[in-house]
Amino acid sequence: MKTPSQTHVLGLAHPPLPMVRLAFIGLGNRGVLTLQRYLQIEGVEIKALCEIREGNLVKAQKILREAGYPQPDGYTGPDGWKRMCERDDIDLVFICTDWLTHTPMAVYSMEHGKHVAIEVPAAMTVEECWKLVDTAEKTRQHCMMLENCCYDPFALTTLNMAQQGAFGEITHVEGAYIHDLRSIYFADESKGGFHNHWGKKYSIEHTGNPYPTHGLGPVCQILNIHRGDRMNYLVSLSSLQAGMTEYARKNFGADSPEARQKYLLGDMNTTLIQTVKGKSIMIQYNVVTPRPYSRLHTVCGTKGFAQKYPVPSIALEPDAGSPLEGKALEEIMERYKHPFTATFGTEAHRRNLPNEMNYVMDCRLIYCLRNGLPLDMDVYDAAEWSCITELSEQSVLNGSIPVEIPDFTRGAWKKCHISRTSDLY
């Protein structure tokens, strides 16, 4: 609930931090990968690690020692993360735990004077989204969701093109998370799988789109959501569920517990969103059918079109009927190459790092904190993109009725016209 003295945090900036002191909660697969990434980033000091499974904590500490870094303090147990967040020598807490613990950990961290960087999605319910917003506004701490797809080179190029007017007035965008994860869902956790995993459990109990942010984040940035426009309402529809059951029958037998398991989540979810200014957004989710990986990333405007999947494609007037190919496509990509790609992305290639998106996101986050700049993604992004999980489920369960999307800025979106990232480098 908003207090009388509470104001928005659009454009929030803090004094520069010469050295950013980090702590990590959660050292499973994703958490360890994040920790290892930050060994490549200048201007950071890893102060503390927390993991409920002590074996994972010991392995993470060993990684740092073997890389030549001081061993950070370790915390474990059900309340270890709280004790770590209560320290006064930490600037930024990374939260790489299961979905259901993201919000309470972020809220506690901010209440104890820490900036937070949360793995996706930042929250699972609208109530949790409001908790993140209210806490960030009351504490004046940064709250960033780690949506790495916003730093994809093609996404950044199309963002730059949109900001320079190359697409004309943008009327429609599309995003998705389409990724065949069936083999992972049924693999044992010791082999990196999701068998008996919280993510699989969610698909048994819920429908809608549980993982909207990879597709939604980049296209919301292109539309300048909550910076002159906002998402107004959505309608959502899910197909029947068949993919998980068929896979289980084939691999475990028709009478196996895996094949008899019921899932509420349909194979394909499609969610349509309209903004206050009348622009449309389509977001899809499908992780259980045999098809190539795709996030779509489609941009449609009055002067041109772009789409990353299945192959990068850009078409501009006066020849928009045919996509640019070969050298012509390379030239337009180079012409509109985003400064983040030109700097941090080039550095990632030079150092032969495995994931350019992650490296650019990491460098950019630390760069902003060390230079006292607003972050590229704020708490309103985290709330707006994450709330689609619950709202899409509400729509699906009620015959695809329209569901209103909250204005987490409480009207401040009308007054903020800062172009995303364009004024921050």
Swiss-Prot record:
Residue positions annotated to bind NAD(+) are: 29-30, 51, 99-102, 119-120, 148, 194-198, 211
What's its EC? Answer: 3.2.1.-
Signal peptide start-end: none
Q: Which PANTHER family match?
A: BCDNA.GH03377 (PTHR43818), GLYCOSYL HYDROLASE FAMILY 109 PROTEIN (PTHR43818:SF1)
**Binding, substrate:** 177, 211-214, 293
Q: What is this protein called?
A: Glycosyl hydrolase family 109 protein 2
The note on cofactor binding and number reads: Binds 1 NAD(+) per subunit. The NAD(+) cannot dissociate.
Q: From the Swiss-Prot or TrEMBL record, what is one GO molecular function term?
A: hydrolase activity, acting on glycosyl bonds
**Enzymatic class:** hydrolase
- Native organism is Bacteroides fragilis (strain YCH46)
| UniProt keyword list | Glycosidase, Hydrolase, NAD
Q: Which cofactor does it need?
A: NAD(+)
What role is this protein assigned? Answer: Glycosidase.
InterPro entries listed in its UniProt record: Gfo/Idh/MocA-like_OxRdtase_N, Gfo/Idh/MocA_oxidrdct_glycsds, Glyco_hydro_109_C, NAD(P)-bd_dom_sf
Give the family per the record: Belongs to the Gfo/Idh/MocA family. Glycosyl hydrolase 109 subfamily.
Q: According to the lineage, what is the superkingdom?
A: Bacteria
Q: Which residues form a coiled coil?
A: none
Q: Which Pfam families match?
A: GFO_IDH_MocA, Glyco_hydro_109_C
